[in-house]
């Protein structure tokens, strides 16, 4: 196994998946987001550890050129299950939330950031590896909830069944990616210090679960849940498996005239800031 860890040991770091850049956004916006996230990390004083696999090598702290190579040459979207296969076969692979959590935990990064996590898809057969990884890795994950295309009720119940702690940052509503409200209630935290107390308590208990910190999309960029659900009802699904989420997200961008893309970029930027604050506080 070849690993290139570019992180400074004593400096706080935030892990970030490569799938959001390579499969989740149009190329232009993906590169702009990467540059913004890097700038935020430099200004705040933490390290942005974009995690991916390039030609079978794990890289912690990917740069813009490497992301561009992955976009140009193509890269498979991988969860935890596929990591050993991608490494052994020398593949280019973009990590999802599950693979990112696994690799960050393996190499000492305590905070991971994403836009929206996976969950249970309608029908109940397709269940994301994100959930099972969160159920077995103690780490802090900052997100804007689960992706709006999922079965919300089933995913919410699965989070409880898998004993995954969930808190809302300055909200008691479980957000749904583009939408601030789901009708599902969560425990509210007011500040980063509360998040740290919960995480430290998890460490004391040796509770090997991910602390899911939910940061709703900024209000000015929200696309309400009802609108998203109505739009999804009219999209004909022409793919299956791992291609479902990127396909539906692209379709929503088209149908909404880019509103969901603006929401996605906005929430990702805010999540990077919150994750950075948490990482810096953890490092003190």
UniProtKB/Swiss-Prot annotation:
GO terms for molecular function: hydrolase activity, acting on glycosyl bonds; metal ion binding; pseudouridylate synthase activity. Signal peptide: none annotated. Its EC number is 4.2.1.70. Mn(2+) binds at residue 126. Its cofactor is Mn(2+). Substrate binds at residues 77, 97, 128-130. SUPFAM superfamilies: Indigoidine synthase A-like. The active site is at 17 (proton donor), 147 (nucleophile). One of its GO terms (biological process) is nucleobase catabolic process. Binds 1 Mn(2+) ion per subunit. It catalyses: D-ribose 5-phosphate + uracil = psi-UMP + H2O. One of its GO terms (cellular component) is cytoplasm. Keywords: Glycosidase, Hydrolase, Lyase, Manganese, Metal-binding. Catalyzes the reversible cleavage of pseudouridine 5'-phosphate (PsiMP) to ribose 5-phosphate and uracil. Functions biologically in the cleavage direction, as part of a pseudouridine degradation pathway. Belongs to the pseudouridine-5'-phosphate glycosidase family. PANTHER family: CARBOHYDRATE KINASE PFKB DOMAIN-CONTAINING PROTEIN, ZGC:136858. Homotrimer. HAMAP family: PsiMP_glycosidase (MF_01876). This is Pseudouridine-5'-phosphate glycosidase. It comes from Thermotoga neapolitana (strain ATCC 49049 / DSM 4359 / NBRC 107923 / NS-E). The gene is psuG.
